[in-house]
């Protein structure tokens, strides 16, 4: 059974981004299929909340999709997200060997998914979000920095892909993306870039919780880590498909 700390890690960060990630997408021709996401989302999120049977169903659905097409990028990324969760459970139970093995497998699958669809926001968002979360829990500073750099680069690419339509995206999507960038650059030690994104939040998202938190961070003598800019107003219905 996942600990409260494990559940908070994935519910507060991974679920928030994955459940809103497709709202970041620009129109594509043809648009990416959401069939898999719609079929596994409820079970995956319920699994992150502690329902192991639901997580098993979601993982089996991903594995069935990959059996049909090993290059199904969304299936790879969703499957990898579940494996990341299982790796965290293993680590916290003291099974370091299994946790390490699962962590490596998850990163491999997630990277493969992004390589197959490098401009697919539906695969970039999960990797960016999960890696930002992972980096915050890596004890080795250099390893954490490398992981966080990949995450932040993904967020930058997502912003570039969304540039033409950014103002029309939902408030939550804009806030989470700009907040993710501010958190990423702050974690990497580039406070100038972090402050630039915080300032952008205050200007483009005025009178919102994102702007309030960004303004508070900017007013501090030094930027806190983390700043708590992301995962604002997230609500998940695990049974909604």
Task: Describe each model-derived feature in a short phrase.
Residues 121-122, 159-171, 203-216, 239-241:
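Boundary/linker segments of alpha-helical solenoid repeat arrays
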Residues 29-30, 63-76, 111-123, 157-172:
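Flexible helix-coil transition and linker loops at the boundaries of alpha-helical arrays
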Residues 219-227:
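Short, flexible, mixed-charge glycine/proline-rich loop motifs
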Residues 2-13:
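Bacterial N-terminal signal peptides that target proteins for export
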Residues 227-239:
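The canonical Cys-X-X-Cys-His
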Residues 13-32:
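Bacterial Sec-dependent signal peptides at the C-terminal "C-region" and cleavage site
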Residues 37-60, 81-119, 129-164, 175-176:
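Short coil/linker segments at helix-helix boundaries
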């Amino acid at each position: 059974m996942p600990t409260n700390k494990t559940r908070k890690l994935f519910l507060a960060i991974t679920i928030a981004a994955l459940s809103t990630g497709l709202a970041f997408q620009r129109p594509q021709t043809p648009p990416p299929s959401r069939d898999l996401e719609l079929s596994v989302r409820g079970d995956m999120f319920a699994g992150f909340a502690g329902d192991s049977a639901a997580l098993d169903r979601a993982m089996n659905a991903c594995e069935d999709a990959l059996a049909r097409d090993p290059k199904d990028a969304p299936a790879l990324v969703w499957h990898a997200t579940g494996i990341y969760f299982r790796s965290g459970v293993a680590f916290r139970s003291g099974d370091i060997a299994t946790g390490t093995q699962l962590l490596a497998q998850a990163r491999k699958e997630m990277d493969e998914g992004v390589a197959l669809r490098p401009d697919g926001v539906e695969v970039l968002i999960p990797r960016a979000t999960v890696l930002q979360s992972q980096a915050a829990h890596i004890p080795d500073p250099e390893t954490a920095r490398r992981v966080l750099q990949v995450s932040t680069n993904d967020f930058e690419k997502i912003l570039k892909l969304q540039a033409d339509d950014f103002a029309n995206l939902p408030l939550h999507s804009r806030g989470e993306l700009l907040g993710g960038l501010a958190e990423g650059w702050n974690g990497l030690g580039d406070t100038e870039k972090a402050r630039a994104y915080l300032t952008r939040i205050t200007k483009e998202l005025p009178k919102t919780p994102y702007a309030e938190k960004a303004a508070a961070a900017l007013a501090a003598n030094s930027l806190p880590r983390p700043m708590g800019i992301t995962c604002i107003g997230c609500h998940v219905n695990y049974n909604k498909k």
